[in-house]
Amino acid sequence: ATRVVYCNRRSGSVVGGDDTVYYEG
């Protein structure tokens, strides 16, 4: 399986963003 990580910066900060992890394949 391929692990794809999407980093969503909602708080405008690099560290304080929300990370969404999707498993594809």
Curated annotation (Swiss-Prot):
Keywords, sorted A to Z: Antimicrobial, Fungicide
Domain of life: Eukaryota
GO biological process, one term: killing of cells of another organism
Functional description taken from the UniProt entry: Has antifungal activity against F.oxysporum and M.arachidicola.
Protein name stated in the entry: Eryngin
